[in-house]
Amino acid sequence: MIQTFNDAQQKVWFDDALLHEDPSQCCNPEFWQQNGKVLGSATGRGTTWFVQLQQTQGALRHYRRGGLFGKLVADSYWFTGWEKTRSYQEFMLLNHLRDAGVNVPRPIAARVQKHGLLYKADLLSEKVPNARDLVSILQESPISDELYRKIGREIRKMHDAQVNHTDLNIHNILIDDQEKVWIIDFDKCYVQIGDSWKQGNLKRLKRSFEKEVCKRGINWSLEAFAIISSYKHEE
């Protein structure tokens, strides 16, 4: 069940079935470091910390801006209401997707720290075990047509839940050791009615394949993408 913790510095929403640690501390990397619970990290726009919870493993991410504006205001956003904050919206969207049967990480906690007219945000979600992103897999070898079909089916489930993934790319598709497909990173994504926008998600995904062919020499072809994009014809 989703619970809420408040104090003078922050507001935290958390799933009490997954979080047995102190909700006031769960989004502080120092808390996990001091308790020897940091398993590793990954660096992208910022650092994602992989941590050991009592019940599961988590991925802790601090929200940061990209682009030129991000160099000026790295991690602060205008506050226009608790339910409009980045971490709360991603936390709730992940719950919506889980309820719809889409393979996404279970959200554990979302934090907002309000400072006057601005806020900072963090998200703690479950780490997908034994999984790699599609880029690293395709750098080593091609994947089967059946695995491409699985990717297409997962996108279909996401679209059936009417979720617009505004940054759908092959870094945000994970494959675990059971060849189960996962979709991650739903920051700034949202529920949208209709169908016209769905093709835009697929076009963005196609561009990411083409980019990584040039950048990293991944094993990929247009025929493989045709298998993914055929998802909309499946029942």
Curated annotation (Swiss-Prot):
Keyword presence, Nucleotide-binding: yes
Membrane topology, from the record: Peripheral membrane protein
Record-level Gene Ontology MF annotations: ATP binding; protein kinase activity
CC per GO annotation: plasma membrane
A Gene Ontology biological process term: lipopolysaccharide core region biosynthetic process
Keywords, sorted A to Z: ATP-binding, Cell inner membrane, Cell membrane, Kinase, Lipopolysaccharide biosynthesis, Membrane, Nucleotide-binding, Transferase
UniProt key word Chloroplast: no
Pathway(s) this gene product operates in, as recorded in its UniProt entry: Bacterial outer membrane biogenesis; LPS core biosynthesis
Top-level class of the enzyme under EC nomenclature: transferase
InterPro entries: KDO_kinase, Kinase-like_dom_sf, Prot_kinase_dom
Enzyme Commission no: 2.7.1.166
Chemical reaction(s) catalysed: an alpha-Kdo-(2->6)-lipid IVA + ATP = a 4-O-phospho-alpha-Kdo-(2->6)-lipid IVA + ADP + H(+)
Catalytic site positions: D167
Protein's cellular compartments: Cell inner membrane
Main location: membrane
Family membership: Belongs to the protein kinase superfamily. KdkA/RfaP family.
Biological function: Catalyzes the ATP-dependent phosphorylation of the 3-deoxy-D-manno-octulosonic acid (Kdo) residue in Kdo-lipid IV(A) at the 4-OH position.
Name of the protein in its database record: 3-deoxy-D-manno-octulosonic acid kinase
Origin organism lineage: Bacteria, Pseudomonadati, Pseudomonadota, Gammaproteobacteria, Vibrionales
